[in-house]
Amino acid sequence: MSYRSTLNPQQQASRAKNAVAEFLFRQLIVPKVYVDARWPNPHSRVDVLAVDRSGAGDVHVVEVKIGTEVLAVSAGMVASLLQIPAHFRYLALFENNNSLPDETCLYAPDGLGRVGVIQVKEDQGGDLSSELRVRPERFRFDASFKQVDKFTAAHPAYIEIRP
């Protein structure tokens, strides 16, 4: 039985964000994971932000797309993701029936970096799982580590390993 039909789009997006947060938590080394993070400033927001190595490592950002948003994944959508300072950037697609965005739009204009693609699936029981479909490549990091340190000190993580 699928619960997707009884949930509104905001609930579906929140479930997908949670699945992606859990995926990054399992993939990275002692990450701090944030959902709906105000990164890189209070006026912008990313769906999922993870900072590896207990807040001292690489920055990973994810934009989650659900339903009809998945069908409209375009170069413009990827271009806005490229404006967010992060070492690794991802699109997470929920309800996309295995389709992937055009690979050429996933690369940085200078070729240094590729946006990863995470597919979020719901099984018959309503459980979500995430799978890496396109491996990301490292981007130039256009922010300072002081900015990362300030963010992690000021915001409680959604998921983290406590000492």
Question: In which residue ranges do the predicted regions lie?
Answer:
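Acidic-basic catalytic patches of nuclease active cores, encompassing PD-(D/E)XK
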Residues: 1-44, 53-55
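Non-catalytic C-terminal interaction segments of nucleic acid-processing enzymes
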Residues: 3-4, 22, 105-163
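Conserved catalytic cores of phosphodiester-cleaving nucleases, focusing on short active-site segments
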Residues: 20, 48-74, 89
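Intrinsic disorder/low-complexity segments
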Residues: 20-22, 38, 47, 76, ...
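Catalytic cores of nucleic-acid endonucleases
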Residues: 66-120
